[in-house]
Regions:
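Bacterial Sec-dependent N-terminal signal peptides
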Residues: 1-24
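Structural signature of tandem-repeat unit edges
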Residues: 24-29, 45-53, 67-80, 92-105, ...
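Consensus positions within tandem repeat domains that build extended binding/scaffold surfaces
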Residues: 87, 107-112, 130-135, 152-157, ...
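Short, T/G/N/S-enriched strand-turn elements that build extracellular solenoid repeat scaffolds
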Residues: 32-40, 55-63, 82-87, 109, ...
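Short, surface-exposed terminal/edge motifs of secreted or surface/virion proteins that either
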Residues: 262-269
Length: 293
């Protein structure tokens, strides 16, 4: 009996130690590159940092803080107001980050393969998200800040759980494969959008509703290919955007502004599609008479 009691006491003690190890740390870094000398508990699961950080500091966070779940960098300044390239690449423990308040760019691969990252707070100052920034993250909803103009190639590629994106009003470009194989069901683009890159929404197989904005100029190769639930779409532009013969493959019906159907049908590759003058009906029914058509 005494052995059992001793064993239970040891187990409870270990459990309490594990609970205690879940700690929050606050650190101020006056000079970039000094974070490693200021963090006293590298096993903490939560940290708030203020001051100045550089690539070496983010390497330390990535490689030397094995339990980190929450990271608040809202009061941090980084060189050039750019979150460093591959800064937290494959930091698989990370679940939430608050980005620096004055950040303008998130660098290539900054959070790629952060497979448990669910929550990102973006600053109002953000202008550019670069290549593969959030590749294969676990985001389910993203609200992008008002000043954002450019979403880079593969920025949210294979974020399989991403169901909703709130696009900002100044967005001009969505890069190649930016939202490829995401789980979006509906997309509402801002009027400012001009280009949608190749494969941008490729294999978004839950996508059912898309409205293309008035200033859109280009929808590139395979941008909406393999979106087999997207049977129809609406365009606000009176001038047909440039497309290719493989931009769409399941989407066959397009509703365009009244009086512009002929112009669309005369444009390259649009003549192969069904163009309908006027507003999108509340209910769309598409009948397939032959398999594969």
């Amino acid at each position: 009996m005494k052995k059992i009691t001793t064993l239970l006491t040891a187990i409870i003690g270990m459990a309490l130690m594990n609970q205690v190890s879940a700690t929050h740390v606050t650190v101020e870094v006056p000079t970039a590159g000094q974070l490693s000398s200021l963090v006293q508990d590298v096993n903490c699961d939560s940290i708030t940092i203020s001051g100045n950080l550089d690539g070496n500091d983010f390497w330390f966070i990535r490689e030397q803080m094995p339990n980190l779940v929450y990271l608040n960098t809202s009061k941090v300044t980084v060189p050039g107001n750019r979150f460093p390239e591959s800064g937290l690449y494959s930091k698989k423990t990370l679940q939430k980050i608050i980005l620096p308040d004055n950040l303008e760019t998130i660098g290539n691969n900054a959070f790629a393969y952060c497979s448990n990252l669910k929550d990102v707070t973006f600053p109002k100052t953000l202008v550019t998200i670069e290549y593969h920034t959030f590749y294969q993250c676990d985001l389910s909803e993203v609200t992008l800040p008002d000043k954002l103009k450019d979403i880079g190639d593969g920025a949210f590629y294979e974020c399989y759980n991403l169901k909703k994106v709130n696009f900002p009003e100044k967005l001009a470009n969505i890069g190649n494969s930016a939202f490829r194989q995401c789980n979006l069901s509906e997309v509402a683009f801002p009027d400012s959008l001009k280009t949608i890159g190749s494969y941008a929404f490729y294999k978004c197989q839950q996508l059912q509703k898309v409205t293309f904005p008035e200033k859109l100029e280009v929808i590139d190769n395979y941008a909406f290919s393999e979106c087999f639930r997207l049977l129809a779409a609406t365009l606000k532009s009176k001038t047909a955007p440039t497309i290719s013969d493989n931009t769409f493959n399941f989407t066959k019906v397009f509703y365009v502004p009244k009086g512009t159907a002929k112009a669309y049908k005369d444009a390259s590759y649009w003549s192969n599609l069904v163009i309908i003058d006027g507003d999108t009906p509340k209910k769309i029914t598409v009948t397939l008479t032959t398999a594969g058509t």
